[in-house]
C-alpha cells in the first residue's frame, strides 16, 4: 500500500464577522497517497479553496488535524510550517504569480535560489530541464509579459516542481485559460505526476477537466456530497 503523504482528519473552518460566524468547512476528512491524483470539484463558494489552503499550511483549521508526510502539520508555528511547505509541497494557482521583472528561467529557479545550500549551476540546469519538460526550452529568457497565458501557467508548473515536492496542490490552475489550453495543462499535470511520482490535489469547478484524476471528490457547502 502506498504511503499516505497528505491527510486531513475531521477538519472544520469557521470565520467570524462581528457577531456572526460562518462555517466554511464542516468536518472533512481526506487521505492522499503517494502518486495519487485527486480532483475536488465544487461551485464557487463551496469551500474547496479554503480546504486547499488548510491542507497546504497557508491557513489553520478551527478544529481538526492535518498531516503532511505522516507528521502533524497544522499545529506548527508559522516559520516551521513555511519550512515544511517548501520541503514537501508545490503550489499552482489560477493566476500564475510569476515575478514580472525576471525571466522564465529565473522564476523557475527562484524557490531553490532562496535556500542556503544552493548550488547555482545545478539549480540553473534543473530549471532548464523543467522548462524543457513543459515545452518551453525556447522561452528561457522571456519575461512573463512576453509569454501567452498558457505559457505563463507552464512556467508556474515548472516552478512548483523545481523543489521535487511530495505533493502538488493546484487551485483552479486552468481558470484563466481557453478550453484547448486548459485540457493541455491538465494532460501535462497528469504526465508530470507520473514522471515525478508525486501526489496531486487539484480543485476545480470543471467536471470535465476533473475526469483526468484517479478519483474525484465533490464538495458543496463545506461538505463532501455523493455525486453518483
Swiss-Prot record:
It is a peripheral membrane protein. It is found in: Cell inner membrane. Residues 6-225 form the ABC transporter domain. It is an enzyme of class 7 (translocase). Gene3D superfamilies: P-loop containing nucleotide triphosphate hydrolases. One of its GO terms (cellular component) is plasma membrane. InterPro entries: AAA+_ATPase, ABC_transporter-like_ATP-bd, ABC_transporter-like_CS, MacB-like_ATP-bd, P-loop_NTPase. GO terms for molecular function: ATP binding; ATP hydrolysis activity. This is Lipoprotein-releasing system ATP-binding protein LolD. The gene is lolD.
